[in-house]
Regions:
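Short aromatic/hydrophobic "clamp" motif used to bind/position activated sugar donors
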Residues: 81
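Non-catalytic, C-terminal membrane-associated alpha-helical segments of glycosyltransferases
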Residues: 228-293
Length: 293
């Protein structure tokens, strides 16, 4: 099996159908597979019968994004894993061969970070009008809506962490890949259309759910991976207190909920502690950050 396309989904059946219909047009089921995990959503289960070529995993109780990915990725058989959000699909012509070519010509390549083209477009041709151009570069992270990782590299790591929820699992996998000595490449030449309503997101403003989970997972990230996490944690907590907790009562309340929860869960999180090499942290500092659309 050449490529496994992997999608975790919840509460977005209509978006998932669009993604699966797009994928079906570009895959060859003799060498490609599509695996979808439904993370505790009865409404999405209703479309399973319409896609018998998909390898479905159905969880009756939600476990959140990162643990769900950890479950799903263990089932993939392809030499290359392509991770997609349920509302994202490839735009690049000859996408599959292009992904394979990148890995075949660079043995040290662990992850390819695709260019994210955000927005709702009438056609893929319209979406391609918004593609940016530039030189590929080695980076520190990848965007979860569209990326590729070699199966052998993924299996050499601990995979997506079960001790995280959502928002933050990509940096955890990325730092483990870097610590193994592999590269993460951002390329403008492989694009995915992330079909989000950018205007609506801007109008929605504050995102309390994201704030809570990002802060929680960032604390855990430093506790697990950094050799000396105290300074990083102080900076993280001060930044979030100053920039969020002091500006809004709901942020303030969530901030302290996360802090006290982190203290209570400290013994269980430290069981996963796996500090990376100092050379990995230095590499992170010197590399160019990923480009977010």
């Amino acid at each position: 099996m050449d490529i496994s396309f992997l999608i975790v989904t919840k509460h977005r059946a209509a978006d998932l159908k669009v993604t699966l219909d797009k994928l079906y047009k570009i895959i060859d089921l003799s060498v490609h597979e599509v695996l979808v995990l439904i993370d505790g959503c009865n409404a999405t289960e209703a479309i399973v019968k319409d896609y018998n070529w998909v390898n479905w995993t159905i969880l009756k109780q939600s476990v959140s994004a990162s643990p769900a990915r950890a479950i799903l990725y263990k089932k993939a058989k392809g030499d290359i894993f392509v991770g997609l959000d349920d509302d994202a699909h490839p735009l690049t012509t000859n996408f599959n061969n292009a992904v394979k070519h990148y890995f075949e010509t660079n043995p040290n390549l662990g992850i390819i970070a695709f260019q994210e083209v955000r927005g709702l477009f009438n056609t893929d041709q319209d979406a391609l009008q918004h593609v940016k151009t530039g030189e590929d570069y080695i980076t520190t992270d990848f965007i979860g809506c569209g990326f590729a990782i070699k199966k052998s590299v993924y299996e050499a790591t601990n995979g997506f962490p079960k001790w995280m929820t959502i928002y933050g699992e990509e940096p955890a996998l990325a730092i483990e890949v870097l610590d193994l000595g592999y590269d993460i490449l951002y390329t403008y030449n492989l694009q995915v259309n992330h079909r989000v309503n950018t205007k609506l997101r801007k109008q929605q403003g504050r995102n309390y759910y994201r704030f809570k989970h990002q802060l929680r997972n960032s604390i855990r990230y430093y506790l697990v991976y950094h050799p000396k996490p105290v300074k990083k944690l102080i900076r993280l907590l001060w930044h979030n207190f100053k920039s969020y907790a002091l500006t809004d009562f709901k942020y303030f309340k969530m901030y302290w909920q996360v802090v006290f929860s982190a203290l209570l869960s400290l013994p269980s999180i430290l069981k996963f502690r796996q500090p990376v090499k100092r050379s990995t942290l230095l590499k992170q500092t010197n590399l160019k950050s990923i480009s977010y659309s």
